């Protein structure tokens, strides 16, 4: 059952307004940050994991490659000196794909495939990077860095690393990182505003009206000042960030449940069975919640409000998230490729029969980018 908000949290939620007054600051190398955050706009084709900070993986209608498009390797593992082995999906903006891996961070031209620049962060990155404030944010196991998207120059770096799943999220002038809990950093300077570590949390987070973090057996909500708001226990083991839409938090558990919680108080609205072995965030949009097949064979779509099952589609084994594109959803199968399905009916519109799909499909600039699980490189369709 969710715990009630504390008096301190209520006061914080009512009076915080912005994060500008949060001043629990530790060192961030900000001698010459050269970063100025403005309105987010629509500059980036795919700015962060889950497309947006709410992690819903929902895009408006956009072009997709033809069904006969061939997959071309973008990053190169051990085939050239200083190769990049990627454990994550890229961020995409201005015709460039930014990939973070175990040996370096690199920027690739989407048209030519040429590497524009590469940077060695000393310790590898195992989560996707994020774009915002005209800056690329990368979390390694030890620190978070702000890099110039143009040349990879370091603008600041600070000791708030990501030790387990959960990609950085940029919201306004704040970068949120998963460092055993949630840490809020000033996007312009790298200064630490606050750190919160809800009991049992740390598997991934989403940012909306509050910050929602999943962990073992629980989902927790924090205010934008870092104070505890509620914690729902007994949810089940969740190994990925939740998705947040229309006042509801959606979390998929490893043991085969999709749970919808009230974003305001953590009460459970509905709970429905899914395949076991789901390790990714649900995709949410247009009244549907779609989860991958996990260790089973079928992706499943639910009514977002009631939890009623709407359709199933056989993809085979898949442990990576779908992506919603307009009135369709791009559902991955590890060995069957990408299936573009009608979001309302589940009927297949298009199919890319590619093998070894190891990540969520990133839809950007008329292309589909993904990581292959066999070589840990990023490939491009289109």
Describe every region a protein language model picked out:
Residues 42, 113-115, 132, 152-154, ...:
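Cysteine-rich, disulfide-stabilized extracellular repeat modules
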């Amino acid at each position: 059952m969710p715990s009630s908000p504390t008096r301190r949290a209520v006061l914080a939620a009512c009076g915080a307004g912005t994060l500008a007054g949060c001043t629990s600051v530790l060192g961030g190398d900000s001698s010459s940050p050269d970063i100025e955050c403005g309105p987010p706009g629509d500059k980036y084709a795919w700015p962060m994991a889950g497309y947006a900070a709410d992690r819903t993986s929902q895009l408006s209608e956009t072009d997709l490659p033809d069904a006969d498009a061939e997959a071309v390797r973008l990053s190169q593992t051990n085939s050239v000196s200083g190769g990049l082995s990627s454990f994550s999906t890229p961020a995409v903006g201005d015709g460039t794909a930014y990939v973070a891996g175990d040996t370096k961070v690199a920027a690739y031209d989407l048209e030519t495939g040429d590497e524009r620049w590469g940077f060695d962060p000393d310790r590898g990155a195992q989560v996707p990077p994020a774009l915002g404030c005209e800056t690329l944010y990368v979390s390694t196991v030890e620190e978070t860095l702000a890099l110039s998207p143009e040349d990879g120059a370091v603008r600041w770096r600070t000791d708030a690393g990501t030790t387990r799943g959960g990609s950085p999220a940029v919201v306004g002038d704040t970068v949120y990182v998963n460092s055993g809990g949630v840490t809020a950093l000033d996007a312009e300077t790298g200064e630490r505003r606050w750190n919160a570590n809800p009991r049992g949390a740390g598997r991934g987070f989403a940012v909306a009206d509050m910050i929602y973090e999943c962990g073992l057996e629980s989902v927790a909500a924090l205010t934008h000042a870092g104070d505890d708001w509620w914690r729902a226990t007994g949810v089940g083991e969740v190994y990925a960030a939740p998705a947040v839409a229309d006042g509801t938090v959606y979390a998929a558990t490893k043991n085969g449940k999709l749970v919808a919680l009230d974003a305001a108080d953590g009460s459970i609205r509905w709970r429905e069975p899914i395949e076991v072995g789901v390790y990714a965030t649900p995709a949410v949009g247009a009244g549907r919640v779609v989860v991958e097949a996990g260790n089973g064979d079928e992706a499943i779509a639910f009514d977002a409000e009631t939890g009623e099952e709407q359709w199933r589609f056989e993809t085979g084994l898949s442990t990576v998230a779908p992506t919603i594109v307009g009135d369709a959803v791009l559902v991955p199968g590890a060995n069957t490729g990408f299936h573009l399905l009608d979001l309302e009916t589940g009927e297949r519109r298009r199919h890319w029969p590619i093998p070894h799909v190891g990540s969520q499909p990133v839809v950007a600039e008329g292309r589909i980018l993904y990581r292959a699980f066999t070589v840990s490189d990023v490939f491009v369709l289109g």
